[in-house]
Amino acid sequence: MENKKISIASDHAGVSLKDLVSEHLSREGHEIINHGTFNNDSVDYPDYAKKVTNDIISQVSDFGILICGTGQGMAITANKQVGIRAALCYEPEIAELSRSH
């Protein structure tokens, strides 16, 4: 994959995974826009999902990654935005298939 600009966000349950994913993608040469959250304090996941979807809609980012406790809340919130198609991806094969449909 060529280098992309990727917006990423999580709620408090996904901070550690978000940080790992961000670091990996950055090492691979992608530009990361990290919308938080940045600690384990309880937050409302829809606030963070909207930051990422707004970046995609306004073409600030090529892709978005949303992480929460189950992934469901972020995906549901993202899919409420016109033009956004979010998929719950829990392994590499599912992520690849979500991009091919």
Predicted regions and their residues:
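Mid-chain, well-packed structural core segment of small domains
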Residues: 64-101
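A short beta-strand-loop structural module common to alpha/beta enzyme folds
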Residues: 31-42
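C-terminal binding/interaction regions
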Residues: 4-16, 92-101
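Glycine-rich phosphate/diphosphate-binding loop of Rossmann-like nucleotide-binding domains
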Residues: 7-27, 32
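Solvent-exposed alpha-helices and their adjacent loops that cap or buttress functional pockets
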Residues: 1, 56-60, 99-101
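Residues at secondary-structure transition points
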Residues: 12, 16, 40-47, 69, ...
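Short, structured active-site "lid" loops
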Residues: 48-70
